Amino acid sequence: MKINRTMTIETNEIQIGDRIQVGHYTATCQALPGEGLALFLLDQYLDKAMQMNKRSTNKGGYQESDLREELNSEKILKDFTGLELAPFDNGDLLRLPFYGEMFGHDDWYNSGAVEPDDCEQWPLMKERANRVAERKGESYEWGWLQNKYVRSASAFCVVRYHGDAAGWVASSSIGVRPAFLIKLS
């Protein structure tokens, strides 16, 4: 009989697929983007659903969104205390995933529906089940991605509750599943 066991160990050698505890959430390593860094994504959406913008617009993209500001506020960052977070290139400690990281550059992306990114799909996201996440108190949830849905001035791309992609109105409150970098010792 073959049995898979999950074990907890102390190590500084992080691998893709390793899981850590972040407050009352868990997060899984998705990539090792550089020397001494590991990129993690929460396995669940944050407890509170959030709007990308208070108004239904994708003007300014994720960089100028209300959600980006809220995601990097002390109110949210307090859940990540105890981790040695490293900033992304834009200085943020938390960010949303890009379409390419979740889905790769698939047919929908190549149709021109999605704001372009230069990201490769994370290995674990090749399995649809890994793109699906829940939010506390909800049986299913949709979640924001950074990319604009370019066929509508009011929408951004999302991961739907069954792991496929869509566009959704920016003023809707849905799931937020942050990615973050950790400095490895």
Where are these regions (language model features)?
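Collagenous Gly-X-Y triple-helix signature in extracellular proteins
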Residues: 1-185
